[in-house]
């Protein structure tokens, strides 16, 4: 009798344990890619009854954002619709406070146990918030190189003198491939080329939704510095006139920037965004690894000079600033090519 009672109690205990919702919390998940910097999910609660996203929002103070009632999570091909919220009303304008930061909660249907990641899709409109590959496995670091990057572009760049400018005219072709692309992520890529003759020229190309590729083609006059914009991913590179080069854009840079923003005490470390072939491949790799920053004079700070200076005083001030800047460049722990580039741009 005692054995039967004990067996019954054990059976009931196992049943209760199996019927209890398995709650799990994922803190600070990695985000694979995003089309926006407005939203972040620093905490996710998973159970057998719901998936709860704790959302941090960042936007201009006194401007509004909106969460569509048709928002859903996409995991392994299945949609899990928005079922509730706290702190925000779907389909209504949410006005940002003075700080430009706010928090709220979004509740969705439960994800199956073992789900490794999901996409957050705020409806299917072109400009709706989309965050891709939100990790649920506890990963702490991004891979060293984005998936799909050719092996030839994974080698360390060679240091040396800054390549000579090419004074020629030609048709330049830039073949763009988005690494980590998902359909609907972005519609086009834009390149702003600083031309010797025409100032800054804008060139855009539609992204093929099937392959995540685009081609930019334009007339170019001399070596040019260009800025590249693709959704939230922004970078710069140097291009030679008349060349055909391949450009790989790491779309994970958008997700990485969101994750790095969580540590408000630490300056985000620049991560690679652009990988290029071509005449300036090594220079572009060093520039991109530095976040596109160089040591140079800031002529637009508002306190560069005093308008009451005489010509001689102004000249001496500029010379002193340049000498101080050159000394800072010489002592900086960067590659020689980057030091030379900083001097050339100063």
What are these regions (language model features)?
Residues 41-43, 91-97, 107-108, 163, ...:
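Beta-strand-rich interaction surfaces with strong enrichment in secreted/lumenal proteins
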Residues 23-48, 80, 84-88:
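Low-complexity, acidic Ser/Thr/Pro/Gly-rich terminal tails and inter-domain linkers that flank the onset
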Residues 135-334:
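A non-transmembrane, solvent-exposed segment enriched in polar/low-complexity residues
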Residues 50-60:
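Short, well-ordered beta-strand segments enriched in hydrophobic/aromatic residues
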Residues 1-25:
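Bacterial Sec-dependent N-terminal signal peptides
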Residues 83-125:
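Short, solvent-exposed, Trp/other aromatic-anchored flexible loops in extracytoplasmic proteins
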Residues 58-97:
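The feature marks short-to-medium sequence segments in extracytoplasmic or secretory-pathway proteins
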């Amino acid at each position: 009798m005692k054995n039967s009672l004990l067996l019954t109690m054990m059976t009931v205990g196992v049943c209760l344990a199996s019927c209890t919702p398995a709650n799990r919390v994922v803190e600070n998940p990695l985000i694979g890619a995003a089309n926006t910097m407005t939203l972040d999910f620093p905490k996710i609660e998973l159970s057998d009854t719901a998936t709860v996203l704790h959302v941090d929002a960042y936007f201009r103070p006194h401007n509004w954002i909106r969460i569509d009632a048709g928002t859903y999570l996409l995991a392994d091909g299945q949609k899990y619709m928005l079922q509730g919220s706290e702190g925000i009303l779907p389909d209504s304008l949410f006005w940002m406070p003075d700080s430009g930061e706010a928090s709220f909660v979004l509740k969705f249907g439960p994800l199956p146990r073992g789900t490794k990641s999901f996409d957050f899709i705020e409806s299917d409109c072109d400009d709706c918030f989309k965050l891709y590959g939100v990790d649920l496995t506890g990963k702490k670091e991004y891979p060293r190189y984005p998936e799909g990057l050719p092996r030839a572009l994974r080698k360390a760049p060679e240091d040396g003198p800054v390549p000579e400018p090419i004074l020629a005219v030609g048709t330049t072709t830039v073949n763009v491939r988005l690494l980590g692309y998902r359909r609907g992520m972005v519609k086009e890529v834009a390149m702003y080329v600083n031309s010797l003759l025409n100032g800054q020229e804008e060139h855009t190309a539609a992204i093929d939704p099937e392959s995540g590729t685009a081609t930019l083609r334009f007339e170019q006059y001399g070596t040019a510095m260009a800025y590249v914009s693709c959704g939230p991913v922004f970078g710069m590179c140097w291009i030679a006139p008349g060349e055909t080069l391949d450009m790989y854009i790491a779309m994970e840079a958008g997700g990485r920037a969101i994750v790095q923003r969580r540590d408000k005490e630490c300056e985000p470390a620049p991560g690679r965004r652009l990988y290029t072939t071509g005449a300036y491949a090594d220079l572009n790799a060093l520039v991109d690894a530095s976040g596109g920053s160089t040591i140079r004079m800031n002529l637009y700070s508002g306190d560069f000079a005093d308008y009451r200076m005489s010509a001689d005083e102004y000249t001496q001030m500029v010379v002193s600033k340049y000498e101080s800047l050159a000394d800072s460049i010489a002592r900086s722990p960067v590659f020689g090519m980057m030091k030379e580039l900083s001097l050339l741009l100063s």
